């Protein structure tokens, strides 16, 4: 990039001129400002650019800076291909970095039986609806879900069917209670 100095002239009205005279003096006084700009030799227009490094910038070798510049210029598709290639080349997978990949706690014996995880997500399934309780069960299904009348009716016709999937234990128990109060036989899976 080539640095150039540009001189600009500003014509200002003279303060010594008579108040009744025109606003522009007969003899303008030039005022020159040096401007420093950087120009791109490829383009014909000049641009003014100021490049500052961040205060907390880490000094890195030239090779690392070039690599970082190349990586930041990748498209999302190119980045995905790069990740796949690195996983294959290095023999790692993204799943190995997941927090679910737990490590044995310090001080715990290595041969101890793993703790049984308590189930946190439940499915509510309607098993049976007596014919005399169909209307009240349809109302309960509509209250528990955002289904319309037709969809709720179709849901209770071909049983057993899951009403809710992946809900908390409290929500599952609440739904079961409401449906059983309406007359349906319900199970939580």
From Swiss-Prot:
Q: Where on the tree of life does the source sit, at the highest rank?
A: Eukaryota
The annotated regions of Basic and acidic residues compositional bias extend over 165-183
- Taken from the record, one Pfam family name reads Ribosomal_L12
Gene Ontology terms describing biological process:
translation
* Compartments, as annotated in UniProt: Plastid, Chloroplast
Keywords of the record, alphabetical order, are:
Chloroplast, Plastid, Ribonucleoprotein, Ribosomal protein, RNA-binding, Transit peptide
Q: Where is this region: Disordered?
A: 1-30, 165-189
User: Transit peptide where, by residue?
Assistant: 1-56
Q: Name one GO cellular component term.
A: ribosome
Report the main location listed first in the record. Answer: plastid
- Extract one GO molecular function annotation from the record: structural constituent of ribosome
Compositional bias (Polar residues): 11-24
Q: Which SUPFAM superfamilies match?
A: ClpS-like, Ribosomal protein L7/12, oligomerisation (N-terminal) domain
Assembly notes: Component of the chloroplast large ribosomal subunit (LSU). Mature 70S chloroplast ribosomes of higher plants consist of a small (30S) and a large (50S) subunit. The 30S small subunit contains 1 molecule of ribosomal RNA (16S rRNA) and 24 different proteins. The 50S large subunit contains 3 rRNA molecules (23S, 5S and 4.5S rRNA) and 33 different proteins.
To which protein family does this belong? Belongs to the bacterial ribosomal protein bL12 family.
Reported function = Component of the chloroplast ribosome (chloro-ribosome), a dedicated translation machinery responsible for the synthesis of chloroplast genome-encoded proteins, including proteins of the transcription and translation machinery and components of the photosynthetic apparatus.
> Know the name of this protein?
Large ribosomal subunit protein bL12c
Which species expresses this protein natively? Answer: Spinacia oleracea (Spinach)
